[in-house]
């Protein structure tokens, strides 16, 4: 297959393919696809030129002969590649589908421009869903002796001490001669007039056009540009193929340059290939497009923090982390909310704040479908489903869902109560507790039920009350299956199964499972004491 592909290519493309040494069948498919797309673009270009040049009779005659010769010489065999049974078996299903799509597309394009009249056998096989591989001797209909002789000519030229420029100028493409819109320009390039004079007679005898000097080619190319308004200019877009080779997409038309169009195509192709270079971390195998990103990533593994704050001495691994930190010292808050005018140090903080105005809650729990405006809110909520309490108090061992609850709890052990009520001088460990307490003096009840209008001083009390209307009982006993609206009711019920009685009477030592039962029991002692006094 590789020998066949090299024969159907011009010298520049043949040299470019050989330098890459494609061995596997998948590699050859990718290279073949790239080249066939160039063939299609040039075939369509010939048709466009015929349509756009209708002004003068002379130009119509010239283009008519050019199109006729192109139709005769550019056939489906020129843009197709066949496989042996062994090569076809090496292709993955995705590569086989790719081959089938491109072959059918190539045939359709040639039919549309009148370059293909009869349907090849491989197209019939592909349309029927059959495997298109051929016997070794039947590939492309090329006799084995002819194939070997043509291949040997080019391989021997590569092995001799001939420069790439001489090879480029000296070798002619055997199949595509005068009249092919793609290779007519390539066929006229030569290194110098000396090479032209040595090879002219031999080529004329074979029906090939003589090679001309680059100066002559440039003049003819300028005249050709005047006749044709549109020329192909390849715009490369890197698309990862089956083996990571670049493919070409989106061909556009533009004014031609002074160099060979196919040469420009190969240059752009090579540049696209170099752009695909990536950088991989040797430790975690993470891949980066730029070396500077890999350098920054490596500091995670090495622990290096080269960027240090001059105010407090805190160090950072990236300069982008140091800049927001310095705003703490300068007080700068460059990110402002357009709705309320509130400012923030970080753009992420502004984004989270804006969701308060928009009501957006992009983070949704998959278990209960509850939504949150911040990811941390979803993480904390998920712990309620799995009953995970990762934050543990070092003094008493009590665990909490959130770290702020742990911080609030730790104040109990220290005994610090910095928040004092101005009315009754009662002290509290948290500002929220003080705020809730002050509502007992003011009588404020800001949380109102939408169903019945009942108001509450705390949000938690409203949430518990709403379960009366919804009928939700989230606390279920694992022993008997009984459900409860309140966690306090659930805790009392659990003591029935465990037999726990934490409430003891100071008079007689009798124990009870509920505080209300202890209160009722204590009243019996009071009645007895009162009756004895009387």
Curated annotation (Swiss-Prot):
InterPro entries recorded: KRAB (IPR001909), KRAB_dom_sf (IPR036051), SCAN_dom (IPR003309), Znf_C2H2_sf (IPR036236), Znf_C2H2_type (IPR013087)
GO molecular function: DNA-binding transcription factor activity, RNA polymerase II-specific; RNA polymerase II transcription regulatory region sequence-specific DNA binding; zinc ion binding
GO cellular component terms listed in the entry, alphabetical order: nucleolus; nucleus
Presence of keyword Secreted: no
UniProt zinc finger (C2H2-type) residues: 279-301, 307-329, 335-357, 363-385, 391-413, 419-441, 447-469, 475-497, 503-525
Induction cue: Up-regulated by Golgi stress-inducing agent nigericin.
Subcellular compartments: Nucleus
Gene Ontology biological process terms, A to Z: Golgi organization; regulation of transcription by RNA polymerase II
Keyword annotations: DNA-binding, Isopeptide bond, Metal-binding, Nucleus, Repeat, Transcription, Transcription regulation, Ubl conjugation, Zinc, Zinc-finger
Residue(s) of cross-link: Glycyl lysine isopeptide (Lys-Gly) (interchain with G-Cter in SUMO2): 37, 40, 178, 235
Record-linked PANTHER family: ZINC FINGER PROTEIN (PTHR24381), ZINC FINGER PROTEIN 566 (PTHR24381:SF462)
Protein role: May be involved in transcriptional regulation. Essential for Golgi structural integrity.
Record protein name field: Zinc finger protein 69 homolog B
